[in-house]
Regions:
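Transmembrane and membrane-interface helices of multi-pass
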Residues: 5-247
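Short extracytoplasmic/periplasmic juxtamembrane "stem" segments immediately C-terminal to an N-terminal membrane anchor
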Residues: 248-264
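Solvent-exposed soluble domains appended to multi-pass membrane proteins
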Residues: 264-631
Length: 631
């Protein structure tokens, strides 16, 4: 049985074909008057039929195979302007066809034209080429960034531009080379062929020949087009990357952070007599959508069966009435380093007030007091481990300045003979090795006479498509699904090892997906109404937290920065109130900021400039005063 068309689709079809045929007829009029020498009835009819068919067929082919526009003939899925856009596209394609036909039939010819003012001509050409290159770069880079880094935010982009972003994976760099860099080069070269040409265009239909496009006209048109392209490219980039939010970040001020900030330095914190170890595992891009639908996820088949079993033994703060949920992305927390800043400081990572605000080891949130600072003061040994380079995104600065951690990254492993001299896989070395190195380091820490705080971050589930270990099988069609399935199993295996160790009795394990995945291809068919949230799990917290009522773990609205007071509570730290930074202890009965004020409102306020943040978190006044006194 054939499904009948909706009224909107039926009207859309008529309008679509009407506009396509109209464009073809207009082209045929130009063809007859400008290119057809003998205007007989048969030649005119042939021109109309040819131009309508060729222009529409070429346009449809490009839309389908090059532009890959989905559901071309399902008009209910397109805007009302869709037929008019098609009309303009057919006209453009048809004009190119007519121009080529004019050249082939000798109606249009080219002739060398020597410019009268060579210096001026070259200036026009160079500026035209420069503007064209910049416009191509703006458009292609915006498209690449939006497609490669799903959910890329302006604050992330600006912070990374202001800081050290070394250590990027080769796969990401390859997509950049094959995408915006190559495309920009091709567009610029093609534009230069037009702009730098010294030939004028001549037109001759019968006996008389005259110039229709002089060399000067070419140069002026090239300049005009390049300026138009540049303006359009900038506008496209601003819209595509939501760069208007940067205006908000710098120009609109909000006192929200100051009004809701509980200063860790002024809070009376009491640690238990026997201080508890803390292990914090950041699982790269691990989110609850990987669970099966009946568990709260989006998958037909559960991609995280081992983490599901672990989660039933621990404590998961879910946004759902039942099933596994968590926290959504929040302002200033949507990429790895920002997520870590949120969880360890109870604050978002905001757009820097000036260049290099995140740029050096002694200038990374100098006014913030983090979990590492607090635990260092309490005599904890602290180690952070990841298979990537600590230089990436400022990780080294964060952990060196705030807690003086032992940093075991790819460089440490390389310099200490833990990996071969020329070994570099994915972002550094793969998670299989990371877990083995982590076991050795945890064993060392446990044998010391101090409590320890161990932090690690995985990388094999990073976009694009993740990294699949040589030891892994591939039961799923999508590469990313295989990477997720193997990675969660290895994470669970590592946690089971920790649970088998003597030190586990006095150890709390906190596991977080650092942020939502940025893998574009894997999520392209997701229902936009499905709410994606980050995975979270706390194992073996102190009894006071373990005995929290069931309603603390469901229907929760919370942010990444709520993890700081929650982690402190999980290891038995008593503190005044239930807040540290702007975060709230999730084990307590105090509503989070998201619950009290609403998620959208809080995120909007955090996007705005905070003078308090700029003057107290990005600056450490105690050091400035001390320096002045020394001087």
């Amino acid at each position: 049985m054939v499904k009948s068309l909706s009224q909107s689709d039926e009207r859309g079809i008529y309008m679509f074909w009407f506009m396509g045929i109209l464009a073809g007829i207009l082209l045929s009029v130009a063809d007859i008057f400008l290119l057809t020498r003998k205007k007989t009835a048969s030649s005119c009819i042939l021109a109309v039929v040819r131009d309508v068919i060729v222009s529409n067929a070429a346009a449809l082919g490009l839309m389908s195979f090059v532009l890959k526009i989905p559901n071309m003939f399902v008009f209910s899925q397109h805007s009302g302007s869709y037929p008019f856009k098609y009309f303009a596209f057919v006209l453009a394609i048809g004009l190119v066809f007519l121009f080529g036909r004019g050249i082939a039939e000798g109606v249009i010819s080219f002739e060398h034209a020597k410019p009268k003012h060579k210096v001026g001509a070259w200036i026009l050409r160079i500026f035209s080429a420069l503007f064209a290159a910049l416009s191509a770069a703006a458009v292609t880079a915006s498209i690449w960034a939006a497609e490669t880094f799903a959910g890329l935010t302006p604050d992330q982009m600006l912070i990374n531009l202001n800081g050290n972003t070394g250590g990027t994976s080769d796969e990401v760099m390859i997509t950049m080379l094959q995408g915006p860099i190559l495309t920009t080069a091709v567009v610029t070269i093609l534009f230069c062929v037009f702009a730098f040409s010294t030939r004028k265009i001549k037109y001759k239909l019968h006996e008389k020949q005259f110039t229709v496009f002089s060399g000067l006209a070419r140069r002026l048109v090239a300049l005009f087009l390049s300026i138009l392209m540049l303006a359009s490219g900038i506008m496209f980039g601003v819209e595509k990357l939501s760069l208007k939010k940067l205006y908000t970040a710098y120009m609109d001020e909000s006192p929200y952070i100051e009004e809701n900030f509980a200063d860790p330095n002024k809070i009376n914190m009491t640690f238990p007599e026997k201080k508890r170890n803390l292990i914090h595992i950041y699982l790269e891009s691990m989110e609850n959508s990987y669970f099966s639908k009946e568990l709260g996820g989006y998958m037909d088949v559960n991609l995280m069966p081992e983490l599901e079993k672990l989660s039933r033994e621990g404590y998961n703060f879910s946004d759902l009435p039942e099933g596994f949920g968590g926290n959504p992305n929040s302002t200033g927390a949507n990429w790895s380093i920002a997520s870590m800043v949120n969880m360890c400081s109870g604050l978002p990572m905001k757009v820097p007030a000036s260049p290099n605000s995140y740029g050096s080891a002694d200038n990374f949130l100098p006014g913030a007091t983090t979990l590492g600072d607090i635990l260092k003061e309490q005599g904890y040994n602290q180690t952070v481990m990841f298979g990537a380079e600590a230089a990436f995104g400022g990780l080294e600065y964060l952990f060196r300045q705030h807690g003086d951690y032992k940093i075991m990254d790819w460089k440490y492993a390389h310099d200490n003979g833990m990996i071969p001299e020329d070994y570099y896989v994915w972002w550094g070395y793969e998670d299989d090795k990371l877990y083995e190195f982590a076991k050795d380091e945890l064993t060392r820490l446990a044998n010391e006479d101090k409590p320890f705080y161990f932090v690690m971050e995985t990388a094999d589930t990073h976009f694009p498509d993740g990294y699949l270990s040589e030891k892994a099988t591939a039961p799923f069609e999508k590469p990313y699904a295989n990477a997720i399935f193997y990675s969660q199993a290895e994470a669970a295996k590592f946690i089971r090892w920790i649970q088998s160790q003597p030190f586990y009795e006095n150890t709390t394990i906190v596991i977080n997906g650092d942020h939502l995945s940025m893998d574009q291809a894997f999520f392209k068919d997701f229902d936009p109404n499905y709410r994606r949230t980050c995975f979270n799990l706390i194992l073996n917290p102190v009894p006071k937290c373990a005995d929290a009522p069931e309603n603390r773990f469901h229907n929760r609205e919370w942010a990444t920065f709520d993890m700081l007071p929650t982690m402190l509570a999980s290891i038995g730290v008593e503190f005044d109130g239930d807040k540290v930074g702007i975060g709230t202890n999730l084990f307590s009965d105090t509503p989070t900021l998201f619950e009290r004020d609403g998620t959208d409102f809080v995120n909007a306020e955090l996007e705005k400039r905070s003078n308090f943040y700029n003057e107290n978190i990005l600056v450490d006044w105690s050091k400035i005063v001390s320096k002045k006194e020394d001087d």
